[in-house]
Regions:
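Generic preference for hydrophobic/aromatic residues in regular secondary structure cores
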Residues: 18, 22-35, 41-48, 135-145, ...
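Polar/charged alpha-helical tracts
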Residues: 98-102, 106, 150, 154, ...
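Solvent-exposed loop/turn segments at secondary-structure junctions
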Residues: 66, 168-171, 218-220
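Predominantly the structural core of cysteine protease catalytic domains
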Residues: 105-200, 204-206, 244-247
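Noncatalytic regulatory segments and standalone regulatory/sensor domains
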Residues: 25, 48, 181-248
Length: 248
């Protein structure tokens, strides 16, 4: 079940939805930011990497690194020597961030160009990292479809970012149907922005209607029913799922 290339399409259509409510569950601390040219990012962006492999299919490695950096910065039971000099209070320098990406790609999350990696490979790499660094966590790929939102909420309540996959089209893998992402405008409108498929993202917030996401170094939102629709009509619930992480 390879995750292949993201498909993102700018949309001119404008729609209005309610802004996120006070009931949104979110991470308790600032999310990882990288100092690219321009404004600081919301998570890493594989498209800005220097290497062709990471640029084209590195979304899973970016999601894994952002999660590990977040744990190292904000969880007292996590100490990762390789990330000791990274500071969560300010944007991370792009060269240091890309060096960490390359380390993870070579040692834990191999990418098969141009297909990337799938959820099972992501879970195996994460568990290997946890074991080598004696971290008190374990990871597994996919949860039952009926428990998806409950598990995402539970992880966010424990201040754990949630790596999600918008899976590839399946079984018609050659199709280019995507799930719609939105941005929140200064006026409080959710406006359609991009469409994605075969792409790892990170959930940083959740309410009854919306998921807050980090993808391509930016903050996006996706409707919960849109994710469910895409999984049912264009992919399946194994490919469209999460990396569930528990404390041992």
């Amino acid at each position: 079940m390879p995750l292949i290339l993201p498909e993102f399409i700018e949309s001119d259509e404008k729609m209005k939805y309610n802004i996120p409510g006070d009931c949104m569950i979110g991470l308790k601390n600032p999310y990882i930011s990288v100092e690219y040219s321009g404004q600081p990012s919301f998570g890493g962006d594989q498209r800005r990497c220097g290497g062709k492999v990471l640029q084209r299919c590195g979304c899973g490695v970016v999601a894994a690194l952002d999660m590990l950096l977040y744990l190292n910065c904000w969880h007292s039971d996590v100490h990762i020597p390789e990330f000791a000099n990274f500071c969560a209070a300010s944007p991370l320098p792009q060269p240091a961030y890309e060096q960490a990406l390359e380390m993870l790609r070579r040692a834990y999350f191999p990418l098969f160009y141009p297909f990337g990696m799938n959820g099972l490979a992501l879970s195996l790499g994460m568990n290997l990292f946890f074991k080598r660094h004696t971290l008190p966590y374990k990871a597994r790929w996919s949860v039952p479809r009926t428990e998806l939102w409950q598990r995402i909420g539970a992880m966010l309540e424990r201040d754990l970012p949630v790596i999600m996959a918008v899976g590839p089209n399946f079984p018609r893998f050659w199709q280019k149907k995507g799930a719609n992402f939105f941005r929140l405008s200064p006026e409080g409108r959710y406006e359609p922005s991009v469409s994605a498929r075969a792409h790892f993202v990170t959930a940083t917030g959740l309410d009854d209607e919306w998921i807050e996401l980090s993808s391509w170094g930016s903050r996006y939102y996706m409707r919960r029913d849109e994710f469910a629709r895409y999984a049912k009509e264009c992919s399946n619930s194994l490919l469209c799922s999460i990396l569930y992480i528990e404390h041992k």
